[in-house]
């Protein structure tokens, strides 16, 4: 039996993220992951540096870095800088980009581009010369300015091409779809809320705490294939309203308040059935059974992102649920 699943948390980089990280550290979360979507949130590296300086033991990391946002040399320097602030605590996730790209009106990068970028960043962090844009690139800091040491890199992947890159270059994989037991490190992103005993998933509190996670399902399916949302409750009406927005501006509206709030246009999508079907929403016993099943399937780390006006309540409730009795490990 392997060690129990690690319970980590994820946040959009915002004004309260240091306080959230301090609370997460105090109640036993393994790591704080921050998103890298500059059209929506604050700069991921600035906020990670602040967390590094205001916490002592909790792991930290960006999830996920997207190659087009920073030159490989700039990215490697940022990684090394934060690693120096929190030695041994930093891990990095890199992927093709979904929200970060979509909010700029772009599609995700190809896996060929992303593979090259990961290899470049890894080489630069090891002090190697790498070819970037046809020229030799290398970190050449004065002595003592940047550390040269390996930093764990997980690859954010869901399909076969990404999983192949994760096997080749990653220390693990990060996913939003299911478990991958072939990896020693498999991190799964989760959203939702632990309901109080007897609480309805249609309560006002549940809608505030898990609603942003449900509406993201519609956003993602729309970006993959607009017709997909027509099969979801309220999907055709939501799509019709969204598509009244001029196409050159639509990407800005689609992801409004992503994983933070539910904008007016999305509120009709909320339902108790939607929350329990598409998010980690339910009473503690239900979620604990799901957590154990997920661990048994091969997930080694859960990244729980709390939403709503009472993030502290969500963090505590999820950790209480996860900590009640021994957690199942993977075989």
Q: Can you describe what each PLM-predicted range is?
A:
Residues 1-331:
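Active-site-adjacent structural elements that line small-molecule/cofactor binding pockets in enzymes
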């Amino acid at each position: 039996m392997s060690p129990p699943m690690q319970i980590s948390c994820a946040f959009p980089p915002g004004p309260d993220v240091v306080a959230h990280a301090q609370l997460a550290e105090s109640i036993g979360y393994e790591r704080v992951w921050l998103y890298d979507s500059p059209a929506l949130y604050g700069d991921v590296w600035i906020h990670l540096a602040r967390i590094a300086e205001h916490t002592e033991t909790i792991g930290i990391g960006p999830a996920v870095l997207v190659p087009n946002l920073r030159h490989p040399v700039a990215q490697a320097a940022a990684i090394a800088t934060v690693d120096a602030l929190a030695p041994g605590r930093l891990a990095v996730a890199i992927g093709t980009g979904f929200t970060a790209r979509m909010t700029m009106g772009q599609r995700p990068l190809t896996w060929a581009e992303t593979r090259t970028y990961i290899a470049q960043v890894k080489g630069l962090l090891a002090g190697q010369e790498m070819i970037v844009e046809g020229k030799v690139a290398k970190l050449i800091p004065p002595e003592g300015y940047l550390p040269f040491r390996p930093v764990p890199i997980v690859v954010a992947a869901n399909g076969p091409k990404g999983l192949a890159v994760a096997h080749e270059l990653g220390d693990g994989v990060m996913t939003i779809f299911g478990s991958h037991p072939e990896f020693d490190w498999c991190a799964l992103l989760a959203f939702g809320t632990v309901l109080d005993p007897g609480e309805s998933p249609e309560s006002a509190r549940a809608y505030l705490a898990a609603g942003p996670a449900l509406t993201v399902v519609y956003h993602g399916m729309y970006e993959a294939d607009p017709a997909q949302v027509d099969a979801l409750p309220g999907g055709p009406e939501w799509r019709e309203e969204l598509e009244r927005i001029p196409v050159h501006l639509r990407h800005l509206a689609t992801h409004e308040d992503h994983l933070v709030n539910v904008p007016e246009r999305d509120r009709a999508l909320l339902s108790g059935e939607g929350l329990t079907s598409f998010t980690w929403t339910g009473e503690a016993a239900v979620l604990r059974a799901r957590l154990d099943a997920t661990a048994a399937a091969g997930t080694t780390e859960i990244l729980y992102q709390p939403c709503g006006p009472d993030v502290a309540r969500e963090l505590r409730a999820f950790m209480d649920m996860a900590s009640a009795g021994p957690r199942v490990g993977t075989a």
